[in-house]
């Protein structure tokens, strides 16, 4: 399955909620009707969505939020199910601990896609070493830094400025002047923002 490269706003409209694919800090609500499905007049149907349909829709939404394809998402779920504790919460914690997501949460990229590009282009150091694998799992205490040559990029400075205005998650500590952040701990479920019902995904894979 190829990665989606079409209009990002269309994906948010399809899910009926802002997935923050275009800008991490600016809502799409003022730009388009999120309650209207893609299409000239929006797709309408009097049929009630089945439980399976709702579960599948939720999985698709989470995949799009984090930019993960199906095979990789299944691996994340299998690992989440293997671990002790709540499977749904484990799944979100694994996704939030991805390097590209941590870079995004620290404000170095305005979107997860932009953060993923920074990682792939070797603009990110983890504990002083270049790491260009977006899916790499970051652990408590890991220090994420922008490579010296990349600190001059205007987009990074702009993204960081917006992040400072909206505030950083409690589970990361960011030193904007140093272009550096510390992954303090894996976030609790209450610390993970987003309109996500992970229990629907657990139900889907438990069928």
Curated annotation (Swiss-Prot):
An annotated Gene Ontology molecular function: rRNA binding
Classification via Pfam families: Ribosomal_S4, S4
Function text: One of the primary rRNA binding proteins, it binds directly to 16S rRNA where it nucleates assembly of the body of the 30S subunit.
Keywords from the UniProt entry: Ribonucleoprotein, Ribosomal protein, RNA-binding, rRNA-binding
Transmembrane segments: none
NCBIfam families for this protein: PRK05327.1, rpsD_bact
Ranges where the S4 RNA-binding domain occurs: 97-160
Binding partners and assembly: Part of the 30S ribosomal subunit. Contacts protein S5. The interaction surface between S4 and S5 is involved in control of translational fidelity.
Source organism per UniProt: Cupriavidus necator (strain ATCC 17699 / DSM 428 / KCTC 22496 / NCIMB 10442 / H16 / Stanier 337)
Domain of life: Bacteria
Region listing for Disordered, in residue ranges: 33-54
Sequence ranges of Polar residues compositional bias: 42-53
Gene3D superfamilies: Ribosomal Protein S4 Delta 41, Chain A, domain 1, RNA-binding S4 domain
UniProt name for this protein: Small ribosomal subunit protein uS4
One GO biological process term: translation
Family: Belongs to the universal ribosomal protein uS4 family.
